Regions:
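A conserved acidic beta->alpha catalytic loop
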Residues: 358, 373-382, 419-422
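Aromatic-rich peripheral "rim/lid" segments of glycoside hydrolase catalytic domains that contact
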Residues: 287-335
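Active-site mouth of glycoside hydrolases
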Residues: 50-60, 64-220
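Conserved donor NDP-sugar-binding/catalytic core segment of glycosyltransferases
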Residues: 427-458, 522, 528, 534
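Short, flexible, basic/aromatic active-site loop/helix in glycosyltransferases
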Residues: 446-447, 461-479, 494
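Extracellular glycoside hydrolase catalytic/binding regions
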Residues: 174, 179-278, 306-308
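Short aromatic/hydrophobic "clamp" motif used to bind/position activated sugar donors
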Residues: 415
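Short, acidic, metal-binding catalytic loop of nucleotide-sugar glycosyltransferases
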Residues: 357-366
């Protein structure tokens, strides 16, 4: 059931007299009345998922305008009187933006738009010149043409943005290749920025070339025509993930009234516009203002997409769109649930003022703010008392317990948690609450974006790894939502006992998401439910934060060992999204599905998930490999053959440095310095943070015991060979139920228990550690009066342990033969350590299986 229908159902059921949600202002005059809009004077900016005029959010409520038949001089927009009348009528119907899709309009048109309070999106027609990349004969100076067009309207206050082009034909893009088209558009983007640095730049894409990666654009625009509301809603969610932290604008949507009828057009445009804004779009352009349309040297009469007829008489769709535009982003009356916003703080005086000021600007009808001061020693409490919020002061007990204190005090159906160094978008709660109204999710999160103006270090930290990210299973369902921006149904959060108090600094959000999903509940994600999140503004603070995250990882691994792999990293089922993600070496080539003859209507880019091998250089444990090679290089003083480790050491340092440089080169800064030296310095600092982050995490992980040689389970005497045993049970139970009981029993001991895949010949694996494990296979025979339960268990030794041990032993033997005692002893100790650790981990795993089966034999199952 589409989101729009679910929200409509909620509207019908809402109580009369509910307080309305405040919306971004929209002209709402009746048709024929003078325009109510204020003439545009300020330049626009893109901030996070939305567009702003100064500090005021602008929802683009637009229509396309043209193309029209040119006059004898080739001027398409020559009838000034008609333009004046059209723009006045647009403003009277709640339209605030006009898109000129194919030709650069004269400056006169922008002046008229400004008089009527309209913004204009102008097209630079890059698609008309792309063919010259194939055949350069008689090619014009494309850059000069673009510069001339930009100069004709640069700096105009009515300018919304420049569109580099509109729908480069899929066959041409396929001929040229993806990278060549991307480079072409990037270069034109740079040309526009050179002429108008403050102007916003986009490219109007469409589903057939969705695969183009254009991260440099200021906003993302797509033309999408779908007659199915379900498919439209699903595709919008996909486009939001492509847009990432940038605004998404529907640059064209519509329906042909000739084929479907004017009533069907009105109904379709109503749900298209409402669905787009409910999905978090920053704006919508309806195609088109009028049925008058001229293309390729002739009037187009086979289609009628206009809101008005060619003579400008209105269709039913015009009133439908006017009403939909007046009610963005949501219907004005919904049964909005009461929300309790909980802010937990400890010595947060530097940022909590911004946080509370942002909460006061929320456009939501029914919410309370609870601030839990977790033992602050600065003037945090004094700042909080200056705001109309509820303050609860406690001794310092840690973040998770502070969150639980807020939960106990909350009166809302929904509990929304916000960090004290973050502040929300005015419609933050609106988008999150709408998701709760339309789904059964237990929790909903949204993106967190670093604001501009926090300084060079904070800007670099925002582009470095280690920030709060979200993990998505699908375009709308999450596996993890970060703690700085997460909301819960209070009943669901109370049902799992709230947050685990052992997590004092970090990790509580990961734990609570896993516990909710363990209960069979789902997590949602809304791309427009965003908050602005200040990053650390000093290298020391960033280092300390990452150490804390490393310790939290170790604590989570102890509680959820089955969620981690052998080296100690989370095995996410979904994809990680967010800024500052470290680059990886991609061994698997990305593919584009073009369809037969390149005719697939939706052509997506498919990228394989990074493999363990390609991800190794960015892992904290890579530094242990580097340290081991450095140790061998030092031992070469005692035994010269170990000098071979020196080139390996140099080789091992190349991947992390290369990936750090690549990540810094790809970073886009919110306020890029103009001086060359400052730009280089900022990227060098970003690269240094990419290198430092895994090291800080490694330190935190090691301090908390998360080491590659860690052990799960209690050591106990157990055989190191295959063991078969059986027991008789007079109580019949299904085979899978006995396995589930064994799994739960062993996990209760705090060990890591994994299930075999569909192609494995074993049922469960008990991981003793990185060097040893044990596996079991269960069989159940049915007999009169009971069941015979058979179990076979055997140790499993990964190849890495014996290989490392044999390598060290061989080197130790060589050093001993050359009478290099120091090197021989050091290498021998390493070999012995791995051997003993493997034995210990295998016996611990076998002992765990034996204890669980003994309990099963006693009838505990």
């Amino acid at each position: 059931m589409p989101l729009l229908r679910r929200l409509l159902a909620a509207t019908v059921e809402s109580r009369a007299g509910r307080v309305l949600v405040s919306r971004s202002p929209a002209p709402r005059a009746a048709p024929g009345a003078p325009p109510l809009a204020t003439p545009a004077v300020a330049r626009l900016s893109a901030k996070g998922k939305f567009l702003f005029v100064g500090d005021e959010k602008l929802y683009v409520r637009g229509v396309t305008y043209g193309a029209f038949e040119p006059d004898g001089q080739g001027h398409e927009y020559h009838d000034v009187g008609k333009i004046e009348r059209d723009f006045a009528d647009m403003a009277a119907h709640g339209i605030n933006t006009v898109r000129i899709p194919h030709t650069m309009p004269p400056r006169t048109l922008l002046d008229i738009a400004q008089r009527h309070g309209l913004h204009v999106m102008v097209g630079l027609s890059a698609e008309q010149y792309v063919g010259y990349l194939i055949d350069r004969r008689n090619a014009p100076d494309i850059e000069a043409l673009i510069r001339g067009k930009v100069r004709s309207c640069a700096g105009h206050p009515a300018l919304l943005c420049y569109a580099l082009g509109n729908e480069i034909p899929a066959s041409v893009a396929r001929w040229l290749g993806t990278r060549r088209v991307e480079r072409y558009l990037r270069r034109l983007f740079q040309v526009v920025k050179e002429e108008d640095p403050e102007g916003l730049v986009t490219y109007v894409n469409y589903p057939t070339t969705e695969y183009l990666r254009l991260p440099f654009l200021d906003l993302v625009c797509f033309n999408v025509y779908l007659e199915s509301q379900d498919r439209f809603e699903a595709y919008l969610a996909r486009l939001q993930n492509i847009a990432a932290d940038r605004p998404l604008v529907m640059s064209e949507l519509g329906l042909d009234s000739l084929r479907h009828g004017e009533s069907a057009q009105a109904r379709s445009l109503d749900w298209q516009v409402r669905t787009a804004f409910a999905a978090g779009c920053a704006g919508v352009f309806v195609f088109s203002w009028t049925d008058e349309w001229y293309r390729h040297g002739q009037e187009v009469g086979e289609w009628a997409f206009g809101l008005t007829r060619a003579d400008r008489s209105p269709k039913a769709a015009l009133e439908a769109v006017r009403e939909a535009f007046a009610q963005v982003p949501f219907w004005p009356e919904l049964p909005w649930p009461r929300v309790s916003v909980v802010v937990c703080t400890h010595n947060g005086s530097r940022t909590i003022r911004d946080c509370l000021a942002g909460l006061q600007r929320l456009a939501y009808p029914d919410y309370e703010v609870i601030v839990v001061d977790d033992g602050s020693t600065d003037d945090t409490a004094a700042i909080v008392r200056q705001h109309p919020v509820r303050l609860i002061q406690t001794v310092n007990r840690g973040l998770a317990k502070a969150r639980n204190t807020g939960l106990e005090a909350a009166t809302g159906e929904i509990i929304a948690y916000l960090d004290d160094d973050a502040y929300p978008d005015p419609h933050w709660l609106t988008y999150l609450a709408a998701t709760f109204l339309s789904t059964a999710h237990a929790a909903v999160g949204g993106p967190n974006v670093a604001p501009a103006g926090d300084g060079a270090v904070a800007d670099c930290v925002a582009r470095a790894p280690g920030g709060p990210v979200h993990v998505l299973l699908t375009d709308r369902e999450a596996e993890h939502i970060p703690g700085c921006n997460m909301a819960f149904r209070k009943a669901r959060l109370e049902a799992i006992g709230g947050f685990d108090g052992q997590f004092r600094v970090a990790g509580d959000d990961v734990d609570v998401c896993w516990r909710l999903r363990e209960r069979g509940w789902t997590l949602g994600f809304h791309p427009a439910g965003m908050v602005w999140h200040h990053r650390r503004n000093s290298i020391r603070a960033y280092w300390k934060q990452q150490i804390g995250y490393g310790r939290a990882e170790a604590m989570l691994e102890r509680k959820w060992p089955e969620k981690y792999n052998g080296p100690g990293h989370v095995r996410w089922a979904g994809r990680i999204y967010g800024s500052g993600l470290p680059a990886v070496f991609s061994w698997g080539r990305s593919r584009v599905y073009h369809g037969i003859w390149g005719l697939a209507p939706y052509q997506s880019l498919y990228e394989p998930a990074p493999s363990l091998l390609s991800s190794l250089p960015r892992m904290p444990e890579w530094y242990l490999i580097v340290a081991s090679l450095a140790g061998l290089s030092l031992l070469s003083i005692a035994w010269s053959p170990l000098r071979l480790a020196l080139p390996l050491l140099l080789l091992a340092t190349v991947p992390p440095v290369a990936l750090a440089c690549l990540g810094a080169a790809r970073a886009r800064f919110s306020d890029e310095p103009r001086r060359w030296a400052a730009r280089v310095g900022r990227r060098l600092l970003t690269a240094a943070l990419h290198l430092a982050q895994p090291l800080a995490r490694l330190r935190g992980r090691l301090k908390e015991g998360l080491t590659p040689w860690r052990q799960h389970g209690t050591p106990a005497p157990a055989p190191l060979w295959s063991v078969t045993t059986s027991t008789w049970s007079e109580r019949w139970q299904a085979h899978e139920r006995r396995l589930a009981w064994l799994e739960a029993t062993m996990r209760a001991e705090g060990v890591c228990v994994l299930r075999g895949s569909g192609s494995d010949c074993w049922d469960l694996e008990v991981r003793g550690g990185f060097f040893g494990a044990a596996r079991l296979l269960l069989a159940v025979e049915d007999h009169p009066g009971g069941q015979l339960v058979r179990l076979r268990s055997w140790p499993d030794v990964p190849a890495r342990g014996p290989l490392f041990m044999l390598g060290c032993a061989a080197l130790a033997w060589g050093a001993a033969r050359d009478q290099a005692t120091l090197a021989a002893v050091a290498l021998g100790v390493c070999a012995l350590f791995v051997a003993l650790r493997g034995v210990e981990q295998c016996t611990a795993a076998m002992a765990t299986i034996r204890r669980a089966f003994r309990r099963l034999s006693k009838g505990d199952c």
